Amino acid sequence: MQKLDFLLCSLPRMTMTYPPSAPAVLKSILLANGFTARTRDFVCEWFYKFKDHPEYNAIDSWTAMGALQVEKDIEKEIDDTVTQWAQELCDTGAEWIGLSIFSYESHKLGKVFAQKIKEINPEQKIFMGGSGITTISEKYPQKLYDAGMIDAFITGEGEQSIIEFAKGNFDYPGINDMNYKQVTPEIIDRTPEPNFDDYNLDLY
């Protein structure tokens, strides 16, 4: 079996208007640079898991509001679901599991996913990226990093920094700090098309 370098995951909460592109873009870049990568679309999986649930509105709000509590049976259902998914992620043997944080509404599940993954395999390496850890005033990724819940984070646009990260250049601006570089038009122009091969686009 071929070694898997990166498993890149989209996380709720996002609308189902269109598929989350960030993991698909990063996958295409990694593949073009000789790394192995797959994606997992938890935005879609979460929606279809819970959309017919009688308490869907409460579950949907729970993901977006950090302090919101739900009934114990719903909390257990969420916990069991994320635990199962975390186990599936660990079972892939990926060197790095990437959690894409689109906005602050993904913060709660991002932390839960990281906790579950580390409980299953404390040696599993996790990194976070996305606008939801870049355009915020609070030190969300830094707190998780300092607590050992994640092993790295990438701020800013990831088109160039993901390559540096994959090569082990953790001193590159935006890796484990907020001092990221703006992506140049030249880098954008040579970015390959997003790779949606692991997505079920018919569900959008």
Give the location of each predicted region.
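Nucleotide-activated donor-dependent transferases that construct or modify glycoconjugates
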Residues: L4-T15
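Conserved N-terminal ligand/cofactor-binding loop architecture of enzyme catalytic domains
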Residues: A37-T83
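Glycine-rich beta-alpha loop elements in corrinoid/cobalamin-binding modules
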Residues: A22, L26-L30, T39-C44, E75-I187
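A structural micro-motif
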Residues: L4, F35, Q124-K125
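Short, contiguous strand/loop micro-motifs
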Residues: P12-M14, K72-D73, S100-I101
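Short Asp/Glu-rich motifs
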Residues: Y18, Y48-F50, E138
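Radical SAM [4Fe-4S] cluster-binding motif and immediate context
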Residues: I188, P192-Y204
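Glycine- and acidic-residue-enriched helix-capping/strand-helix junction motifs
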Residues: M14-P23
